[in-house]
């Protein structure tokens, strides 16, 4: 692996340590954040509830300007948009979009949320809005597969959306721990974080044990129908990054 990205949820606390550790190992560090996007204004404390209180969006700094803008975006989330999570809105993304590459994110992304509800046209409209903000070639539809049926449904619709809109695809893994054998310790840490017990049925969990750093061979096995998406991911992570 010659490149790696950090995209913690809503924060950038770890980027400096990550950057230094990656450079020390000869790895190209991609600095990013998986931000929370409010469904309306970041100042609105009423819009949306539950899973619609915010959507996920992955942002990657392409260069030094992008890194500076990413810090602005994350700071705005805390100082102006905090409501359960540090949220930003489309106005913030428009103001600080330069030098940033965006990915549609996981099942909690706006595009994927609509697709899971059968609202294809709304999903496509959301994707086109993000492309308009970040520019053609700077917004990607993100394929993921952790053995979850909903992801396979979303992936098929993203392939269709790619054909209809020309928005390029990438294929990623939603990494929350390093190795496959770290799944159980990670589950325990989730319980500690959320004040739950392992036996609680309704607690937050990452099903299937697939949220680790996968090899190129494992990713190719998951996405034989989307080799171009895998190639785009490789190209994405060999692009210039902040120094």
Residue ranges and their predicted role:
Residues 1-239:
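Phosphodiester-processing cores and adjacent nucleic acid-binding clamps
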Residues 241-243:
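Positively charged, low-complexity/disordered segments
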């Amino acid at each position: 692996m010659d490149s790696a990205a950090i995209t913690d949820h809503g924060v950038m606390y770890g980027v400096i340590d990550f950057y230094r550790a990656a450079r020390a190992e000869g790895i190209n560090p991609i600095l990013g954040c998986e931000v929370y996007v409010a469904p309306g204004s970041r100042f609105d404390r009423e819009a949306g509830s539950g899973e619609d209180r915010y959507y996920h969006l992955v942002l990657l700094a392409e260069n030094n300007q992008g890194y500076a803008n990413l810090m602005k975006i994350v700071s705005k989330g805390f100082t102006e948009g905090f409501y359960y999570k540090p949220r930003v809105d489309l106005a913030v993304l428009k103001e600080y979009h330069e030098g940033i590459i965006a990915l549609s994110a996981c099942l909690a992304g706006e595009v994927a949320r609509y697709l899971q509800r059968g609202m294809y046209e709304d999903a496509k409209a959301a994707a086109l809005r993000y492309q308009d903000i970040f520019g053609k070639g700077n917004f990607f539809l993100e394929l993921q597969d952790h053995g979850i049926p909903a992801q396979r449904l979303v992936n098929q619709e993203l392939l269709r959306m790619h054909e209809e809109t020309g928005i390029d695809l990438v294929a990623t893994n939603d990494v929350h721990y390093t190795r496959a054998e770290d799944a159980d310790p990670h589950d325990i840490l989730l319980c500690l974080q959320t004040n739950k017990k392992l036996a609680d049925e309704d607690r937050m969990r990452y099903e299937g044990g697939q949220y680790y750093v996968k090899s190129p061979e494992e990713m190719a096995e998951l996405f034989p129908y989307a080799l171009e998406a895998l190639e785009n991911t490789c190209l994405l992570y060999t692009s210039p990054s902040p120094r």
